[in-house]
Amino acid sequence: MSLSNKLTLDKVDVKGKRVVMRVDFNVPMKDHKITNNQRIKAAVPTIKHCLDHGAKSVVLMSHLGRPDGVPMPDKFSFSPVAVELKALLGREVSFLKDCVGPEVEKACANPANGSVILLENLRFHVEEEGKGKDASGNKIKADAAKVEAFRASLSKLGDVYVNDAFGTAHRAHSSMVGVHLPQKAAGFLMKKELDYFAKALESPERPFLAILGGAKVQDKIQLISNMLDKVNEMIIGGGMAFTFLKVLNNMQIGNSLFDEEGSKIVKDLMAKAEKNGVKITLPVDFITADKFDEHAQTGEATVASGIPAGWMGLDCGPESVKKFVEVVGRAKQIVWNGPVGVFEWDKFSKGTKALMDKVVEVTGKGCITIIGGGDTATCCAKWNTEDKVSHVSTGGGASLELLEGKVLPGVDALSSV
C-alpha cells in the first residue's frame, strides 16, 4: 500500500476553510502530567501549515487511553494536552468539554479567524470505537444509528478533513473513516510515515535487517512471517526469544515468558527463514532476575546453562549484544520493532541501549534506520536518539500492521487523486 494515489495536505487549498483534523495525541501521562510529548510535537507542522495558509480554524480531535466509551475526565481528559499544545504552538488553544453535539457544533460553526480548537477525548463516546463498556464494566456495542449521528456531528466541525493520526490508522473508528467531507487529506506526519514504510517494504536497501523484540510470539507471528519475505537478516530478542529457544534448543527458561500458542508455529517460521535464505540471530546469554521487579536480585545465564526455576530472563547478556551489534554493522537498512529487554529498568536496559548505540552509529554511516513505534520509540525518547535515526514512527500498532502487510483503514478512507 503506498500513498502515491492519496490526497495530501500540500495539495489542498485551506484558505478561509475550517479544517477538522484527526491527530494522535494519545500521550503517556503520570499524575496528569505528560511524560513524553513526541506525538503532540509531531503534529505541529501540519497544524501550522493550515494556519500559515489562512485556514479559518483548525479543530483537533483525538483519543486518549481506553475509557471504553465512558466519560472519565478525571483520568483521560485532554486538558493537560491543551496546555502543552498552547506552549508548542505559541498561540491560544480553546479546549471544549466534549467532541460532538450542539454546543461543540456551535463553537466550531463560525470561530474567529485562525482559531485552534481542541475537542475532548473521542473515546468518551462508545460511538467512536463502535464498542465499549457500560458503567458496570459489561461489554456493549454501539447503536448503528447513534454511530451515524456521531459521525455526522464530527463532519459538521470542518469543511476539509485532514488525518495526521498514523498511530490509529489501523483502526476503522468513526473519526478515522466516518468524517464525510469532500476532501479528505493526509497530513504531513501521515505522509512521512507512509513514504518511509513504503520505501522500506517495496524497494529496500540491502542487506535489510529486521530487529524484532517484545513479549509474545503470537502477537508477532504475522510480522515475523511477512518480514521473512522481505529481509536478509533478522534478530529475534526480548521476551519472545525464550519461546524460540525453548522449542529449538530445549532450553530451561525458568519463569521467563513462554508463549504456549506461539510455540506451535516456531518451527514453521524457522523453516520459512531457511527456505528464504534469511539468517536469524537469537540471544545466547541473559541477565536474569529472581522476580519481575526493578530492584530484583540479578544473575547471568546462557542458553546452555539454562535459567533456574523461580528466575527469569529480563535482558540479553554481553555475548548476545556482541552478536547483535555485528549483525547491525552489516545492514544497509533496518526496521526495529520491540526492545530486547526490560529497558524501563536500568538493571535490564543494557542490551537495548547497546543495540540503540550501534543503530545510531550505522545511521551516521548511511544506513536507513526505521524505529517502529510503541516501546521502541519510547527507547529513543529515553536515550535522546529520536533525531539520530532515520525515522521514528509515531504508531506502534499501525506500523506493526503495515509491516505485517495489511491495508490500514484510516489510509484507505482518504480521498484518491
Curated annotation (Swiss-Prot):
Chain positions recorded as (2R)-3-phosphoglycerate binding sites: 23-26, 38-39, 62-63, 65-66, 122-123, 170-171
CDD domains: Phosphoglycerate_kinase
Keywords: ATP-binding, Cytoplasm, Glycolysis, Kinase, Magnesium, Metal-binding, Nucleotide-binding, Transferase
Biochemical pathway: Carbohydrate degradation; glycolysis; pyruvate from D-glyceraldehyde 3-phosphate: step 2/5
InterPro entries found in the cross-reference section: Phosphoglycerate_kinase, Phosphoglycerate_kinase_CS, Phosphoglycerate_kinase_N, Phosphoglycerate_kinase_sf
Subcellular location: Cytoplasm
Residues the entry annotates as binding AMP: 215-216, 220, 239, 313, 344
Binding site for Mg(2+): 215, 219, 375
Binding-site list for ADP: 214, 238, 343
GO terms under biological process: gluconeogenesis; glycolytic process
Positions bound to CDP: 214, 219, 238, 338, 340, 343
Pfam families: PGK (PF00162)
Enzyme Commission number(s) of this protein: 2.7.2.3
Essential cofactor(s): Mg(2+)
Reaction equations catalysed: (2R)-3-phosphoglycerate + ATP = (2R)-3-phospho-glyceroyl phosphate + ADP
One of the record's GO cellular component terms: chromosome
Family: Belongs to the phosphoglycerate kinase family.
General function of this protein: Catalyzes one of the two ATP producing reactions in the glycolytic pathway via the reversible conversion of 1,3-diphosphoglycerate to 3-phosphoglycerate. In addition to its role as a glycolytic enzyme, it seems that PGK-1 acts as a polymerase alpha cofactor protein (primer recognition protein). May play a role in sperm motility.
Subunit structure, interactors included: Monomer.
The protein, known as: Phosphoglycerate kinase
Organism: Gallus gallus (Chicken)
